[in-house]
Amino acid sequence: MAIAIYSNVLDNGGISKFVYNMQNAFQKENIRSEIVTFSADTIYGDNITLLKCTNHGKRIIMLKNFIKEKNIDAIITNTWFEGAIAKLAAILSGKKIKVISVVHIRPNLWGFSKNDILRKNMAKLSLKMCNKVVAVSNELKEAMIKEGWVSEKKITTIYNPVIFNKIKNHKNKFIDIENKNNIDIAVIGWIQPRKAQDIIVKAFGQIKDRSFTLNFIGGIEDEAFNSEVKMLIEKNNLQGKVKFWGPRKDIFKILKDMDILISASRGEALPTVMIEALYCERPIISSDCDYGPKEILDNGKYGLIFKVNDYNGLSKCFNEMVNNNELYNKFLNLSQERSKLFTYDKAVKSYLEILE
């Protein structure tokens, strides 16, 4: 079987990370996979085809030719119009090809206005044209059904492939977080309003009795919001306590040097970085946004949770975690076991069950 993983754009975001991880997962199971895209900021690895084109009609033709040239048997693509493009290209190729559309984010963050009936209906049609729709979390699947985007029969949940290394038998560890001189905090993701770095800055403006460094790791998606975050840093006198790393690929390595991961997102689907933190045994504090964080942390069993936009709640969670060795080490020692849900082999098996 030859599987194409199609995304209109490859950048440093979470969906692109899914594309690369999915290809890596299939290759580890000796399944031929090809990435195809029409725009790329960066390209990592082999078996990647860049077809530079902005016209949707031409994209269909170019993708059809790609299918025939590479002898593709199935396509995994994203939500929105990519599913329709993939299905039309598959039909024109003359091959019986299954197309799977993967939903990575809740529909109200797809960029539609309330009155944008035409594009909403086109997105629904695109999902309907695909053979199957995959949601990356159970919460997201339920929302897609409830809001009428897809039927219950059409959609299933498959967690993203995040963990590729073997998870060894765990040995209990102990870190004296109460007496650590400086707490290194990882905040990973695009700098944009949905990731809510502003809430994190406001929360840590209230922390006076512990030394810490906020490590913002990720590219700038919204320049105006980035300026707002920097103004908040100055307003809260945090200039010497914040480090901007920019986009990075070595997240596992970075997490190993951190003490805590914090996510204050206003909306997610299945935040990969939280799974990476679990594998690296880094305790997590997260907002309760829709969807994904509560599911990953099992409603607080594997990390602390605060309400979206509640910077007072975030500062309270931080103080609770770093001033309680028992709590901190409980989360640390539960983390890797939880990360087993998100291994590459489980994802591959689930996708093959749909495709075969």
Each language-model region and where it sits:
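A short, active-site helix/loop in glycosyltransferases that binds the activated sugar's phosphate group
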Residues: 130-154, 162-164
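Nucleotide-activated donor-binding/catalytic signature segment of Leloir-type glycosyltransferases, i.e.
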Residues: 227-246
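Aromatic "clamp/platform" in nucleotide-sugar-dependent glycosyltransferases that forms part
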Residues: 247, 266
